[in-house]
Each structure stands twice: as structure tokens, then as C-alpha cells.
Amino acid sequence: MKQPPETLKEPRKHGNMEFPCAFYDSICTITSVSHHWHEEMEILYIEGSGYSVEVDTHDVTTEEPSFYFLNQEQLHSMKLSADCLEYAMLFRPDMLSFSSYDLTQQQLLLPLLGQKLLFPSRIPLASPAGQELKTSLLR
């Protein structure tokens, strides 16, 4: 994956050295988030009318509530209406890595860390995977 230009890198740090993860939730007060990227992966959930999400300059918007997965260094932007609900979790993928080497580390985590395994851009809430994500992440 080609790294986006440094000028679009988001300067904000998410989490800290001890816990490289951050959670955000809000009723949208910001109507636009310009193109940017960050070193963290992001799991984003949006519901409401009148929103759009762009990932790597491709519009992945739908009218239904959805989860969006933003891989490391993936360029993205959003336009949101005032009635949208937004939940976001940003994390450094290396925090998932084990200190011991096993099959999960070899077949799942190392490809994820090396960006050889990528999440899909969007998972609809109505799908079985979307329902599982809702149960796991939106408690």
C-alpha cells in the first residue's frame, strides 16, 4: 500500500504509550472531517441520515447504519449531518501482538501488522458480522 502524503497525516495522537488505543463517541457536531490518515487502525460506526464516508478516494457510503474499517495509513474523510451518531475506536495494531508465537500470531496478526491482511471498508449493521460487531463493540 502506498503511503499517503505526509501533509495529510493527522497530528493528533490516539491513546498513549501504555495503552495505544482511544475511544470516541458523539452526536455529530463536526459536519466535515477532511482527508487525513493516521498510523492507527480505526473502527468507525455511523448511523443517521445524510452522511458520507470516503476511503482511499472511493465513496463507501450507504443509507444504513454501518461499521467502517480504516486500515493503517489509509486515506479517509467524512461528511456528517447533525443527527448522526458516531463511535470510533482507534488503536495501534501492534497492541494485538502476543509475546509468544502461535498459529494466531502467524496466520492472522503478522499479516495484519504487515498490511497483507486488510479489513473490508464497510460492514452493514444488518449483516451477521455487523450484529456481532454491535454486540461486541457497542455495549
PLM features: what roles do these ranges have?
Residues 1-67, 106-107, 117-120:
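Generic protein-terminus/edge-of-domain signal
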Residues 2-19, 75-139:
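A hydrophobic/aromatic-rich effector-binding and dimerization subdomain
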Residues 46-48, 71, 81:
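A short, compositionally biased micro-patch
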Residues 51, 73-75:
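Short beta-turn/strand-loop junction motif enriched in small, turn-promoting residues
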